[in-house]
Amino acid sequence: MMRRVSLLFWLLVATLGFTACVRTTEQPVSTPPTQPTATLAPLSPAFLPTSTLPVPTPRAQPERMGTFFFYWYHCPERACDASELTAIPPGWLTPLPDDPDPRDGLAYSSINYDWFEGELRDLVDVGFDLILPVSWGDHPHPWFRQDRLDLLVQANGILEKPLPIGMFLDTTAQQAMYNDFVADGYRFGPTIPRMPLSDARSGYFFYDLHIKGFFERIPREMWATEQGRPIIVTYTALCCDELYRAGELWRAVKEAFRADFGVEPWLILEETWFTPEALAPGEGLQPLELVADGRYHWGTALHGPQTATLRNFSVTSVGPGFDNRSIVGITDPRLQPREAPPGGGPPSNGAFFRASLAAVPPATDLLLIETWNEWPESTGIARASHQGVDGQPLPDDFYMDLLRRWRRGG
């Protein structure tokens, strides 16, 4: 049941000048989707890689490196269709190697403690400085709800040096939550109505139902921070309409966070939030650039490396390639082969990722790898059974090792 009074609801009512009543009746039960829809890259590439591979040169390393970590899997029962994958990770079809405890399963699953621990150890070994677990709030699927973060925290806590944890706020969830709220069911996608930011309740779906619960489950000593402020990275603005109010929305979110946690978050928004109307919203409304702390590009696993800078804070994102053609029901199949050099030329193992890493500016404050383990879109660099250009299996840690050696300057 929705709470009668939400801090952020009344903040938004006050700041946006709207009045509305929060519905307090029990929400209708909707039929959840079979699995979360994969987060698709924006349709229009903003970057085309150069026609030749950059030549790596000695360089200063980015200040920090993080990655998007997906825990929406529950093999072998759910969200585990091998026919949608181009590379199979350990634990997907067969038990995880060296999993000592069958009581919580032996598979690639967010209910399996040993899966979390194994992933975290690999992340540390590669050289990541922080991780960004993808979050949809309390998704209808029990294996992808906020409480699954408890196992992540538990596994992280046994590491010699726990990985700092930030939030990857998948805004697809806001579209789904809003449609569920207005009695249309938990639905999302390009043909589904978007959430209007002029609705004073919009902040409730971002903060109270999502962001707040995430950070309540991550101990403060594990927060990934920038200048002492916990990091939130958002997905695209495809969830929402009326983006001229985006600055007001995110200002209210930051104020509500500060009221609950005593500090404002470091907010890194995806580039699609920065529309002309969001940047120049009109008299009396907050321009988005004055509210956000950083900006970045999603879709670099498909389109190539991108860097965005806001007030001297630079974020670069890169990925190894992209292939969503096997996803059931996909209406926009796209491909960036991993072995294809940007602009053409003889294929080689990991060519797209190598070129992307070589293009990272040395002054980057935060490098984001897209992704650690988003398998249906084939953007993961974690352990998996990739094939080489000769048709032979690559080592399951091929992409991990490629990044590890690059990070260490090799």
Task: List where the protein language model places each region.
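Short amphipathic alpha-helical "recognition" segments used for binding
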Residues: 7, 30-31, 378
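Residue-level detector of intrinsically disordered/flexible regions characterized by low predicted structural confidence
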Residues: 5, 25-28, 374
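Bacterial N-terminal signal peptides that target proteins for export
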Residues: 1-8
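A general secondary-structure boundary signal
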Residues: 19-20, 409
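Ser/Thr-rich, Proline-interspersed low-complexity disordered segments
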Residues: 11, 15, 21-59
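Glycan-processing catalytic domains of CAZymes
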Residues: 47-410
